[in-house]
Amino acid sequence: MTDTTLVEAGDPAEDAPEWPMKRDTGCPFDPPPGVRKLLAEKPLSRARIWDGSTPWVVTRHADQRALLSDPRVSHDGLRDGYPHISADFKFLSMAQPSFAGQDDPEHGRIRRMVTLPFTARRIEAMRPAIQKITDELIDGMLAGPKPVDLVEALALPVPVRVICEMLGVPYEDREFLQQNNNAMIYRDTAQGDAQKAAIAQAMYLKELVGTKLGDRGDDILSDLAVQVEAGEITQDDAAGIGMMLLGAGHETTANMIALGTLALLENPEQLAEVRDSDDPKVIVNTVEELLRYLTIAQDTVRRIAAEDIEIGGVVIKAGEGIVFPLNAANWDPDLYPEAPDRLDIHRANARRHLAFGYGVHQCLGATLARVELQIVYSTLLRRIPTLALAGTLDEIPFKHDQIAHGVYELPVTW
């Protein structure tokens, strides 16, 4: 927090910049230059989003933590003034509400229904299964022709197979589900197409929950079916929860696998250290540093003030939206004074990043993502020690049109 004189927010500045800001294509790992400028010069400011409204943009790590843990900051997307990502996201929040978009106590009540499978103990017990999936996919890479698209061959299949098994979703339906998910998260999806995809996804999951009512398995959707029968939630609620877990459970992890591998390939000395080390702490800290450095969920955390809140010498009034660019907080020199713009797998406080958000809405699957990344990076580099980029960095198609950063393809060879 800063010691500036307390001021109240009046009308938004006429020169509020457009949001989201564009990345510099020559620096694909970096936050947009405009975001870095706000962090350095105006850490609490306004920006203009798609509907013409001007929510607050909070860039400093300390301010983000303070607000994301403040009960006066609401995640209720139905509140007037909530800064939705797009018109389609606004529609989705109203048509298919999820517990992730609710406040306590309702958020906590629903979250507790799905927490058990994501506890550290449960996830650690899944390591052998995740290792087996990873080895099978790398076997396929080694047996096939080169170059290989790492996204298609490894980065996407690992988290998709894992989350499908956890949810009880048939893996053979993955293409249908992935197409719908893509339509919902692309910034440039034609208005209405995301809505159609969301409806199709919700109907699919609602029907699947219906089948679980009479034929339960050892999976999350079956657990939700029990709650439906008990009258704790509706079948639509269960479908909405499943939809959120399905999307969040694979998209960001798939992007991290591919983009993190690319970042290591661009830092060969650090890659070699990760590959050759027998110390498990090395891969653990490498994953934390990659999460900090890349911050896949670059523009997903939005909130609204439920009451007037003073922070950093500014009053954010009730009903005003707040945008949290996590990539700015994770490059904040106040927390990371030593070259935050560089990858450093030995960074001592890397784990203090906000890549999974913060507060009661922190990512439910954070432990799962960490374990998947640890297994995939270490196994890939150990089994293919000469892994290399097949082409040049400027040929890689980056996901600049999505709310989650990543690459569409990553051709590799060895």
Curated annotation (Swiss-Prot):
It is an enzyme of class 1 (oxidoreductase). Gene3D superfamilies: Cytochrome P450 (1.10.630.10). InterPro entries: Cyt_P450, Cyt_P450_B, Cyt_P450_CS, Cyt_P450_sf. CDD domains: CYP105-like. Pfam families: p450. Heme b binds at residues 75, 107, 111, 303, 361, 363. Its EC number is 1.14.-.-. Disruption phenotype: No longer produces the 16-membered macrolide antibiotics FD-891 or FD-892 and instead makes 25-O-methyl-FD-892. Double gfsF-gfsG deletions make a diastereomeric mxiture of 25-oxo-FD-892. Changing residue 300 to A: 93% epoxidation, 13% hydroxylation activity on FD-892. The keyword Acetylation does not apply. Changing residue 89 to A: Very low epoxidation, no hydroxylation activity on FD-892. Pathway: Antibiotic biosynthesis. Its cofactor is heme b. GO terms for molecular function: heme binding; iron ion binding; monooxygenase activity; oxidoreductase activity, acting on paired donors, with incorporation or reduction of molecular oxygen. GO terms for biological process: antibiotic biosynthetic process. Residues 1-32 are annotated as: Disordered. Keywords: Antibiotic biosynthesis, Heme, Iron, Metal-binding, Monooxygenase, Oxidoreductase. Involved in the synthesis of the 16-membered macrolide antibiotics FD-891 and FD-892. Consecutively catalyzes epoxidation of C8-C9 and then hydroxylation at C10 to convert 25-O-methyl-FD-892 to FD-891. Consecutively catalyzes epoxidation of C8-C9 and then hydroxylation at C10 to convert 8,9-epoxy-FD-892 to 25-O-demethyl-FD-891 as well as converting 25-oxo-FD-892 to 8,9-epoxy-25-oxo-FD-892 and 8,9-epoxy-10-hydroxy-25-oxo-FD-892. In vitro is furnished with P.putida putidaredoxin and putidaredoxin reductase to provide the required two-electron reduction. PANTHER family: CYTOCHROME P450 YJIB-RELATED (PTHR46696:SF1), P450, PUTATIVE (EUROFUNG)-RELATED (PTHR46696). Belongs to the cytochrome P450 family. The macrolide antibiotics FD-891 and FD-892 induce morphological changes of human promyelocytic leukemia (HL-60) cells and have cytocidal activity against tumor cell lines in vitro. FD-891 produced by Streptomyces sp. MAFF 225003 and MAFF 225006 inhibits growth of rice and alfalfa seedlings and may cause russet scab in potatoes. Monomer. This is Cytochrome P450 GfsF. The lineage of its organism: Bacteria, Bacillati, Actinomycetota, Actinomycetes, Kitasatosporales. The gene is gfsF.
